């Protein structure tokens, strides 16, 4: 069964089947062997071998086969979605029939990776081997159109059933939220509870393991899933290294090791409830110390003013997490001066021989924006007039992105008493006039 996540897929499969047939000659000898398939030649594809295509076609060398069988084989290959065109021809003689399949591979842009979310009983290599024996054309990439994703799902279900493992295989099509472009197909086992008992970090030192275990404490008892573990590794675990100068640390795909159940536990929990030890491998890499920080591109604000905001002392482990926080402070400073589109990009220059890193902080200041129109909504006439009178940032003055918050903090006494307010501030940038219109909206709770 296929569930679609944020992506509507219109399956449209176009391929042609052209036939060039040379009929067998007359005579008894030819009638005996003419339909025996003795050879298959595959041309046009750069992704698949003759053996893989033959296995996927459903044909077998040595079987009796005729034109109808070849049409079905081409249809089967075309329906997979892996070929944009499929053409066949054959010739027959007294020795048998020779078939040629001319294929055109589907463009790589129409293929997406397949991921296996929670098949904790298998390694990736074991799954790939099991799949390729059942779906010969499977090579980690799947077409966005065609039936191959379904064939893979059916094969995975067959593997589970054969090994007497619980669960039902399903898959999700993942797409980018901004464009609905399909990015991956994610297979997972449903109708089984797989909970994390503990988390291991092969590759980490004992000191690092202690820090990682603390950072990953929310995983204990959580549902096992590779996507969620990858998110935790990126958001919670990687900063453990980045804070300490391990700027090239990387986490690999997670695996799960099934915790053996006693007979009593298995009877109590049932086969559809499992515990696993999650395994998240890490490669820490070198620890880098800061050798220097250099500002580039800043002119509206002097280097002497922004330098104290950066806490990257030379000779100390480079704290990339702190650097991002510091750059956010610099960004806020620029916005308080009216530079609303400022961009600051750190460029790390590594010296692996010395285990040091030098940062160039590249500033694109953008244009100076000025105060535009002020709109206050949701208040009665008198309260609105009081608030507008208290607003001192006038049209045409350099905009200060800090001002709206400070204004609201200082003018609470001007609002009607006895009312709790939800207050939202919306800034609208006019790129042509280089102005900022401010809307402050009040809503009674």
Where do the model's predicted regions map?
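Periplasmic polypeptide-binding modules associated with outer-membrane biogenesis and secretion
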Residues: 21-445
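Intrinsically disordered, low-complexity regions enriched in serine, threonine, proline
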Residues: 3, 19-20
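Bacterial N-terminal signal peptides that target proteins for export
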Residues: 1-8
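Bacterial N-terminal signal peptides
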Residues: 8-16
